[in-house]
Amino acid sequence: MDINGKVAVVTGGASGIGQAVTRRIAGAGGKVVIFDLNEDAGQAMVAELGADNCLYAKVNVVDEDSAKAGIEAAVSAFGTIHINVNCAGIGNAAKTLGRDGPFPMDVWSKVIAVNLTGTFNVLRLCAEVMAKHDPVNDDGSRGVIINTASVAAYEGQMGQAAYSASKGGIV
């Protein structure tokens, strides 16, 4: 897909891999909507890339209403969505059984919620928007969705059970 003139939603787009993706898409002539919880970093990216090319939306990817509001902001600002890159993610190291007892289930649940459920929440809403516009190229595609995984999906590391499981779910 030619990125020039296309609109992308990038989750976790204010830092790390998501920030690099945001810069790359904007550098290729795309418009980027950053979904992130870090408002200062998100606004800094808008200042760097320019408000004509970039929009920040404070979105909790796990929360359906928050994600819907972000999608609505993207469509309102740029008309549609052609690309969705899901980079939002967290990792909390904890052993299955540590000195203080078994792996805390609230930690497990939060990592799975953000990394796996949050990814699906945003991609399904982006897909709904993509399905409404005309194909963007000769093969009939209406958009592209990229979900960021990790080698941890295949090679678990000590203390990374939840992270590995969440990335395995993405794969």
Residue map of PLM features:
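Active-site loop immediately N-terminal to the catalytic Tyr-X3-Lys motif
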Residues: L97, E155-A161
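Substrate-binding pocket helix/loop in short-chain dehydrogenase/reductase
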Residues: K95-S109
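Conserved glycine-rich Rossmann-like NAD(P)H-binding loop of the short-chain dehydrogenase/reductase
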Residues: A28-M45
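Active-site helix of classical SDR
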Residues: L123, S166
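The beta1-alpha1 cofactor-binding region of Rossmann-like NAD(H)/NADP(H)-dependent oxidoreductases
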Residues: E39-D40, K58-I71, M105
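Canonical Rossmann dinucleotide-binding motif of NAD(H)/NADP(H)-dependent dehydrogenases/reductases
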Residues: I3-V33
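Residue(s) in the substrate-gating loop at a strand-loop-helix junction
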Residues: S150
